[in-house]
């Protein structure tokens, strides 16, 4: 005998016989048994679509209807009674000495009518639709009784309209339903009355009772007179076998294909699996067989319900007592930026817990939405028309900080706008401005107010250190111009400066005094030993009202004919004095520092112009330039393209005459700037004896600017040189203790100023 059975079990048994698809499809029955919005996503999500006879079963139809109505939880309690164990001996007889199968002649006739090469449609019409896809091997007959409760948790948590707090209908909880379900088999009648009363009063539950077979009879004395039913449970399993085992070998594979197409594709197409993905190859009459429109529509409706729930969660958060109490505690006498609100937020533990509750609810909601969206894309990937998906954006703490600002500053005249901290303005509904309130002053560091004015909170009352109050605003206490103390810039533009340096124009030459005990200008000398020379301005004696800036250096060096000597120059700069010990070495050709440029002159001798161009980028103060001249011998290396240099004293033949050298002239290019030492001394005197209130701060600001501008012109290096101390020591003739006191006062004052960063310097002058 052949038994029909629900397609979920049919599919699991049938697939076990099709070897190439076994590993891919073993999870189908598990997916069918899961809740629609919680099952694991896989290439076979389409199995839960409206395809095949499985979706025509009563149990699944009830399940889908309840799910679409919002019933998200199901409680089921049941008991069963198994009396008779039945077995099918058809397969056993076939394997026993070739005995004929005890099958109906009609079944054999339909097999013969199929022929040797039937189409899938012929197999479906002649076998599957008449006899099903499986037959029963063994089962248990008996009876069962069950109670199923579908619960809508959202409606269950809401109190019925018009009900009082003391009524029983308003106190229904999940615990109550648990207790009622557990008492069903103890006191069936009273339990059903109670459940039906709750179902009518709250519409939050749906109750279904099933009683079949002998167990469902009220009179247990006459069990044999009641027709038994198949009992399926972990203890009483139904064993099915695919119908193809009863067919000839040439029909078995085609039958499996036809059965899968019938179950999975509802006979609207051919079932195909490829690369771990399965779908239906639709027939011409059913172009949308892969598109489960009903399931897609249900999921879109679920997304709409999620959007409504999302709005309700946010609205409940704004209407909560914790949110309202937090808003009342916010200070109104100064402007609250998002950082300040966040700090106050972290201080309110009740408000934090309420926000965490909102976050947890939102996370669960968005996880559910993402599962639905993933499933929706999976089901609709072969639809001709893709679904439109719109989900609300997740609101972070930054959104709520701006939302709180909107409640504070954009909530006038019954209109709520949106506040922007960047523009410090409100965007009101319908492009109006009536929602904007008067914004209080901003309290903070730097140019922000120290306090707001008590009579008008939109204006500053007091300011921070380094700022002054002007017309209700805090403006920086800008130091007066330092140009009358010391100059820094020239009127020449960069291009003009570059042109004059290239031409070695005498208009930018600084006339310095040449001093050397080792040599004289325009005189030949033996270059075997190091020669020392210097160019000094002696400003303390001759130019006390000027400081000088070096832009370049030029030397004209001549050698005797056929000389292999190569001049090597080392340059040291003393910014405001004359000694070598307080000079810094010029890093020629290191990193991005300029290198010497040699230009051959049209003279009988080997004469070259050696030019070092600093320009505006590398310009610096100078008082004395120390130049050390060494020479080396240039010889050809082992390779013709290489050159080897020797020191003259290290040459193989020290007695050999290496030639002579002379320097025709040395020029320093730069410019001189105004310098008033007496005015700076008077400025320093105000640190101890201020003229008026506030003049000490003004003097400190001016000295800070002079210090920073002087030190900014220090040579390149990891740390700046302390040129300002050299200026105080050599040009103002201050003692070491006075210099230390002034530097300490400037550092202490600079630390009080807002948004300032002090820097470390390297001492140059003792």
From Swiss-Prot:
UniProt cross-references to Pfam families, sorted A to Z: BRINP, EGF_BRNP1-3, MACPF
Disulphide connectivity of cysteines: none
Signal peptide (residue range): 1-33
Cellular component GO terms, alphabetical: cytoplasm; dendrite; extracellular region; mitochondrion; neuronal cell body
SUPFAM superfamilies xref list: Growth factor receptor domain
GO biological process: cellular response to retinoic acid; central nervous system neuron differentiation; exploration behavior; multicellular organism growth; negative regulation of cell cycle; negative regulation of mitotic cell cycle; nervous system development; positive regulation of neuron differentiation
Recorded family membership: Belongs to the BRINP family.
Protein name per Swiss-Prot or TrEMBL: BMP/retinoic acid-inducible neural-specific protein 3
Organism, as annotated: Rattus norvegicus (Rat)
GN (gene name): Brinp3
């Amino acid at each position: 005998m052949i038994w029909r059975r629900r397609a979920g079990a049919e599919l699991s048994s049938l697939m076990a016989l099709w070897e190439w698809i076994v590993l891919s499809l073993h999870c189908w029955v598990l997916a069918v048994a899961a809740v629609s919005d919680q099952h694991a996503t896989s290439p076979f999500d389409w199995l839960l679509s409206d395809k095949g006879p499985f979706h025509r079963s009563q149990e699944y139809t009830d399940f889908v209807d309840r799910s679409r109505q919002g019933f998200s939880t199901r409680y089921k309690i049941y008991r069963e009674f198994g009396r008779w164990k039945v077995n099918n001996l058809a397969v056993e007889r076939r394997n026993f000495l070739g005995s004929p199968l005890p099958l109906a002649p009609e079944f054999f006739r339909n097999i013969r009518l199929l022929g040797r090469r039937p189409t899938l449609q012929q197999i479906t019409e002649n076998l599957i639709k008449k006899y099903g896809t499986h037959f029963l091997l063994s089962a248990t007959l008996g009876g069962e009784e069950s109670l199923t409760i579908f619960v809508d948790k959202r409606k269950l948590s809401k109190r019925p309209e018009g009900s009082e707090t003391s009524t029983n209908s308003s106190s229904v909880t999940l615990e109550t339903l648990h207790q009622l379900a557990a008492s069903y088999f103890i006191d069936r009648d009273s339990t059903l009355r109670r459940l039906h009363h709750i179902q009518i009063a709250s519409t939050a539950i749906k109750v279904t009772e099933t009683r079949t077979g002998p167990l469902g009879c009220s009179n247990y004395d006459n069990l044999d007179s009641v027709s038994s039913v198949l009992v399926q449970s972990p203890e009483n399993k139904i064993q099915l076998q695919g119908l193809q085992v009863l067919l000839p070998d040439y029909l078995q594979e085609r039958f499996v294909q036809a059965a899968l197409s019938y179950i999975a594709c509802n006979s609207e197409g051919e079932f195909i699996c490829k690369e771990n993905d399965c779908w239906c190859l639709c027939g011409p009459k059913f172009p949308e067989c892969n598109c489960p429109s009903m399931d897609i529509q249900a999921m879109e409706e679920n997304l709409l319900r999620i959007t409504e729930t999302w709005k309700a969660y946010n609205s409940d958060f704004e209407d909560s007592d914790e949110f309202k109490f937090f808003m009342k505690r916010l200070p109104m006498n100064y402007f609250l930026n998002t950082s300040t609100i966040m700090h106050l937020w972290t201080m309110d533990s009740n408000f934090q817990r309420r926000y965490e509750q909102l976050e947890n609810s939102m996370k669960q909601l968005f996880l559910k939405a993402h599962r639905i969206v993933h499933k929706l894309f999976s089901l609709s990937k072969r639809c001709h028309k893709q679904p439109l998906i719109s989900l609300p954006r997740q609101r972070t703490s930054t959104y709520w900080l701006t939302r709180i600002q909107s409640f504070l500053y954009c909530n006038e005249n019954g209109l709520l706008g949106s506040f922007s901290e960047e523009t410090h303005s409100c965007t009101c509904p319908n492009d109006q401005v009536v929602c904007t309130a008067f914004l209080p002053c901003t309290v903070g560091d730097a140019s922000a107010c120290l306090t707001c004015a008590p009579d008008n909170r939109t204006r500053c009352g007091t300011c921070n250190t380094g700022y002054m109050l002007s017309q209700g605003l805090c403006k920086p206490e800008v130091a007066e111009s330092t140009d009358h103390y010391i100059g820094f810039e020239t009127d020449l533009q960069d291009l003009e400066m570059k042109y004059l340096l290239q031409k070695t124009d005498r208009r930018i030459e600084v006339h310095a005094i040449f001093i050397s005990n080792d040599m004289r200008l325009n005189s030949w000398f033996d270059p075997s030993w190091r020669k020392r020379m210097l160019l000094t301005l002696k400003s303390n004696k001759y130019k006390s009202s000027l400081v000088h800036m070096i832009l370049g250096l030029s030397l004209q060096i001549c050698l005797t004919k056929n000389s292999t000597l190569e001049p090597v120059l080392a340059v040291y700069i003393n910014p405001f004095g004359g000694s070598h010990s307080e000079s810094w070495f010029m890093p020629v050709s290191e990193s991005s520092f300029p290198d010497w440029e040699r230009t051959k002159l049209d003279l009988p001798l080997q004469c070259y112009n050696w030019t070092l161009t600093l320009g505006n980028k590398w310009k610096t103060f100078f008082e004395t330039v120390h130049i050390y001249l060494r020479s080396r011998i240039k010889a050809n290396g082992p390779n013709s393209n290489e050159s080897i240099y020797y020191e003259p004293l290290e040459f193989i033949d020290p007695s050999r005459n290496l030639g002579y050298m002379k320097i025709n002239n040395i020029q320093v290019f730069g410019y001189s700037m105004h310098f008033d030492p007496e005015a700076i001394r008077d400025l320093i005197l105000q640190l101890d004896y201020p003229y008026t209130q506030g003049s000490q701060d003004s003097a400190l600001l001016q000295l800070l600017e002079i210090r920073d501008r002087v030190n900014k012109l220090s040579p390149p290096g990891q740390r700046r040189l302390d040129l300002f101390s050299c200026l105080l020591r050599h040009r103002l003739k201050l003692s070491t203790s006075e210099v230390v006191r002034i530097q300490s006062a400037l550092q202490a004052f600079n630390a009080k100023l807002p948004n300032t960063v002090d820097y470390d310097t390297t001492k140059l002058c003792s």
